[in-house]
């Protein structure tokens, strides 16, 4: 990722900045904000035995094909579909901007790690980013902030058809309405369960993990108010793209967030301009790997 709250706040900021000619395609906030969580929702989609996870597929496979299929689906004029696609593009932009930094940081921390802490460092970094952006943009602690989306805000029928038609022949055979609805419900319930209204839940889960000598995997997902600012590169130290060390940046998380917002606005506008003009999507814009941030095949 970035994680849940970061994607939500990013999508809210993008909505404020979309030009009116593009903003008119976002008529449904529920679908837009679900789209802002991208393929993360479908890590909880139950595939048939032997089939690869749908969330992983959307992050790593046939990215350009999925966007081209989205473009075709948008021709229906269904506001649920166009709103979801706009949100999905914010997720794409957020991931391709933030993920190279997160993986660069993980590589450095792994090199420096003394071995005393065992857990999901990736999740902890992104959870702390969530807490940081909630404090910065909402002026709340993560204990006070509640993810606003509910299942009743979403038309799953339209989105099911979109996903069924957009994920390729091998995958679409395994996209089923009941499983689709269940994945959306699970995603919302799962993140509500992770919400820690007092700070006590994280302490309890962490303590239980410690007692039974198991990695701090689940507790890493629960937001904390006392986040670790060393994860944010506020001092603007240089870092490299892990998959292309010729790309060197000094961006901290504030600069990355701003870049993700501007890239989201640019890509959403470009997508709907292509829809109106009947032109194909630019490959280099819509074919980047969600984890590396680099053009697939580039």
What are these regions (language model features)?
Residues 1-87, 93-298:
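N-terminal leader/auxiliary helical segments
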């Amino acid at each position: 990722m970035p994680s849940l709250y970061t994607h939500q706040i990013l999508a809210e900021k993008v909505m404020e900045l979309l030009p009116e000619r593009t903003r008119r395609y976002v008529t449904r906030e529920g679908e837009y904000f679900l789209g802002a969580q991208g393929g993360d929702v479908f890590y909880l989609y139950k595939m048939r035995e032997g089939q690869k996870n749908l969330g992983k597929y959307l992050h790593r496979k046939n990215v350009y094909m999925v966007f081209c299929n989205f473009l075709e689906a948008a021709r229906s004029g269904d506001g649920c579909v166009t709103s979801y696609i706009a949100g999905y593009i914010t997720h794409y932009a957020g991931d391709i901007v933030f993920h190279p930094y997160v993986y660069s940081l993980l590589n450095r921390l792994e090199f420096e790690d003394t071995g005393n802490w065992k857990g999901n460092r990736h999740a902890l970094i992104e959870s702390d980013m969530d807490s940081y952006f909630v404090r910065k943009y909402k002026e709340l602690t993560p204990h006070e902030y509640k993810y606003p989306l509910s299942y009743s805000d979403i038309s799953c029928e339209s989105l099911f058809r979109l996903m069924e038609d957009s994920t390729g022949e091998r995958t679409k055979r395994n996209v089923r309405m009941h499983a689709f609805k269940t994945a959306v419900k699970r995603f919302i319930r799962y993140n509500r369960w992770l919400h820690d209204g007092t700070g006590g839940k994280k302490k309890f889960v962490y303590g239980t993990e410690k007692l039974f000598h198991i990695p701090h995997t689940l507790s890493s997902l629960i937001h904390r108010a006392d986040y670790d600012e060393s994860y944010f590169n506020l001092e603007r130290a240089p870092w490299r793209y892990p998959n292309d060390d010729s790309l060197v940046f000094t961006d901290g998380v504030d600069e990355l967030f701003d870049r993700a917002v501007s890239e989201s606005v640019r890509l959403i506008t470009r997508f709907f301009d292509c829809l109106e003009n009947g032109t194909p999507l630019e490959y280099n814009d819509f074919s980047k790997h969600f984890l590396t941030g680099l053009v697939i095949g580039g």
